[in-house]
Amino acid sequence: MPTSGSYDYSVTALQIIESAAEDIGVIAAGQSMDADDLATMLRALNLLVKQWQGTSDKFPGLKVWTRQRLVMPFEADKNRYLIGPASGDDRSSVAMIVTQLGAAKAANATSVTVDSTADMTAGDQIGFQLSAGGIGWTTISSVDSATGLTLPANTVGAADSGATVYAYTSKAQRFVDIEAAVLRDWSNPSQPIDMSIDIYTDVQQYENLSQKLAPGDPTAILVEYQRINTAITTNFVPPNFYKSLRLTVIYPAEDYDNASGADDIAYPQEYFAALEWELARRSAPKFGRQWTPDLQEHWRIAVAEGVNFNPVNTSLYFEPARESSDVGSPFTSY
């Protein structure tokens, strides 16, 4: 018989939950989950994936597939920005479109010409580097041609020909870790220039600055992870709006919202067994099931082998003395 020739095997939250429930004897093979038991294990699965997001669990492979690169434009007279999808958060996106005005824009113009409208759609947010400084934001009413856009009635402000234009559909998510940061110069959007900047690892580094609101291109940023967004503070107030931050970050794990467990698991295939057995381990006490040495060995193999895929440059060692009832990661960086 020939091989399948396919490589797209996937599982749903329900399938991971049922496999974990079978492992600890909550259900027999082929049985369906009771609604209350399903809700209990779905909640445990969500708690698990949130704990395993980013790098806090020391699973190096997670850095590869949750990595995103976002662009964060600057605002006038501002050095603290909130990154996240909430309405009050600042404008950053992992799919930022950057171009330039092909002709000057009058203060209240509704018809504008840009170098390229590629990837722009009606309803997108669009911002123009203004002649008076700062960025004026509005929405796109329609994309009329390869270079033409229509805007709603607005008082965004005047912008010069060649001014930088930013556009995006969705804001970036609150990220849970940052790996790199650069200051990007968009003077030539087709060939932007990146300048490396520092990431403060201690709030004291920022607090020791004698002038925190001095104008200038940022050379360092402070990153503070909040409950619903991530705060970015620059060490200077950016005066040049044809420049932006470009951050390489780790996105959070997705939620599993569907009450019946129909959501696909948003993990690579090599993590499926690790998720199954870690969920089994965390769920066993909830159902009064004993965690036996045999189950512990199955768990150890599944988790150890799963997390060794797609490694980055991180040194790991296994802690064999960890108690089997410990629901944290069995791995530690050094």
Name each model-derived stretch.
Residues A109-D115:
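Short alpha-helix capping/helix-loop boundary micro-motifs
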